[in-house]
A protein has these predicted regions:
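Terminal, low-complexity, charged helical segments
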Residues: 3-8, 12, 45-53, 60-67, ...
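Hydrophobic alpha-helical transmembrane segments
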Residues: 51-62, 147-162
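Hydrophobic, membrane-inserted alpha-helices
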Residues: 39-46, 63-65, 134-142
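Hydrophobic core of alpha-helical transmembrane segments in multi-pass integral membrane proteins
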Residues: 128-144, 157-172
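Cytosolic-side membrane-entry/anchor segment at the start of a transmembrane helix
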Residues: 2-47, 174-179
């Protein structure tokens, strides 16, 4: 079959741009909604533990926040990867095809170059660490202080502590602050 004259590299690249930006938009919505789901899970577990007077129920909180936090982090990383791909690969290729150096998508770089970007990224990292690090850690501390103990619950709590620490470390590592 002969290639169609209607299909050009530029059209293919623009179609790819549209697709990756749509994926990025979808992932942003999903990631942001994960915070609401995490807050709902926290309230549910804390309310249930308080109502039932069973501190062991607090052990559900680190599990829930770790699962939701890893999902949040994975989506956040993909969102950043899409932006980086558009800035460093797709945009410049389209610019070259158009006879202009650089990327035709100015916003992809412009919003990353303001003077308060580093401050915002640090604040966002702290905000991310609260639901996915501080709150589950507080639940574990409350369990250790007020729980009945026992080998298996304490063992589970220590495994959860390791998972929460690993997630918190990854949140800090992935907190991209470079322009």
């Amino acid at each position: 079959m002969a290639p169609s004259s209607d299909i050009t590299i530029g059209k293919l690249l623009m179609a790819e741009y549209d697709r990756v930006k749509e994926e990025q938009k979808t992932r942003i919505g999903f990631r942001d909604n994960l915070l609401y789901v995490t807050l709902a899970a926290m309230v549910t577990v804390l309310f249930g533990a308080a109502q039932a007077h069973h501190t062991e129920l607090l052990l559900a909180l680190p599990v829930a926040t770790c699962v939701l936090g890893w999902t949040y982090l994975a989506n956040d990383q993909k969102i950043s990867a899409i932006g980086r791909y558009v800035r460093t690969d797709l945009g410049p290729r389209l610019g070259d095809l158009a006879g202009e150096p650089g990327s035709p998508f100015g916003w992809e770089a412009a919003h990353r170059s303001d003077s308060r970007r580093k401050q915002r990224k640090i604040i966002q990292c702290v905000v991310d660490l609260i639901p996915f690090g501080a709150v589950p850690l507080a639940a574990l501390v409350a369990f250790w202080l007020y729980g009945a103990g026992g080998f298996w619950p304490v063992t589970v709590s220590l495994v959860e502590l390791a998972a929460v620490a690993a997630l918190a470390a990854q949140i800090v590592v992935y907190a991209e602050s470079a322009p």
